[in-house]
């Protein structure tokens, strides 16, 4: 008896390999609906294969370190170097060996709608997470580059969880003054699972802070622009002036004082 397209779709959903013989069996079915269902499932499986390969590639730095005997590898990244207002936030995340988190990538490449679910997945699976926050006053005193380093060191010191002391650091494009062995990786948030996890944690943490600042200082659209120099933010500056969380060493704030 010929199966309905609905029945075929149900069977296709159970297939997870492109080499499954059921695909060959369906090639003789000329129904347009069947061909669409087959193509859709093949694309879905290929997407899963591609994602698995991408995640494997993102573990390449970690795998080298596993082979060298390191197991408590912390990824470190920051968010908030460029905004005109608010702190710079760093995160330090220690993931279990060979941990893969679906969808994890550089936070700038992930749709904002998915940030929270990936953040929650990191919280559930991480062995330890630390946060470092350096406010705008310190940024103005020592410059954003040095403030970023301070935030990263604070994140390491503040690790909480089952593991609080990493044995190796993978850092996004920075070198830190710490006795812990480390490696600086250019575009690390796109090439290391551990750094990408830190990127998301730092991003979600800072976004939440900026949403709180939106309530304290309405009119600058902080909840949406996170302190970056958007049109709405610049309009707020013209209308309401500089707030206590603005970076006075950054233009155009500096010229407004």
UniProtKB/Swiss-Prot annotation:
Recorded catalytic activity of this chain's protein: Endonucleolytic cleavage to 5'-phosphomonoester
Primary localization: cytoplasm
Compartments where located: Cytoplasm
EC assignment: 3.1.26.4
Cofactor(s) demanded: Mn(2+); Mg(2+)
GO cellular component, one term: ribonuclease H2 complex
Superkingdom of the source species: Bacteria
Annotated ranges, domain RNase H type-2: 71-257
Role played: Endonuclease that specifically degrades the RNA of RNA-DNA hybrids.
Classification via HAMAP family: RNase_HII_B
Protein name: Ribonuclease HII
């Amino acid at each position: 008896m010929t199966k309905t397209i609905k029945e075929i779709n149900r069977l296709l959903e159970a297939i997870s390999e492109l080499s499954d013989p059921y695909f060959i069996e369906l090639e003789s079915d000329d129904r347009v609906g069947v061909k669409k269902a087959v193509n859709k499932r093949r694309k879905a499986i290929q997407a899963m294969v591609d994602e698995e390969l991408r995640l494997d590639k993102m573990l390449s730095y970690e795998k080298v370190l596993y082979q060298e005997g390191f197991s408590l590898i912390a990824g470190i990244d920051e968010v908030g170097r460029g905004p005109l207002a608010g702190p710079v936030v760093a995160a330090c995340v220690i993931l279990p060996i060979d941990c893969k988190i679906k969808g994890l990538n550089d936070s700038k490449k992930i749709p904002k709608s998915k940030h929270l679910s990936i953040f929650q997945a990191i919280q559930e699976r991480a062995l330890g997470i630390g946060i470092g926050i350096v406010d705008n006053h310190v940024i103005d005193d020592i410059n954003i580059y040095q403030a970023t380093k301070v935030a990263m060191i604070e994140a390491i010191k503040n690790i909480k969880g089952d593991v609080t002391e990493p044995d190796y650091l993978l850092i996004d494009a920075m070198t830190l003054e710490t006795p812990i062995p480390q490696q600086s990786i250019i575009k690390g948030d796109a090439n290391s699972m551990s750094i990408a996890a830190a990127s998301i944690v730092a991003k979600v943490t800072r976004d939440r802070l900026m949403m709180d600042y939106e309530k304290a200082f309405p009119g600058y659209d902080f909840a949406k622009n996170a302190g970056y120099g958007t049109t709405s933010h610049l309009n707020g500056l013209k209308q309401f002036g500089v707030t206590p969380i603005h970076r006075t060493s950054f233009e155009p704030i500096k010229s407004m004082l």
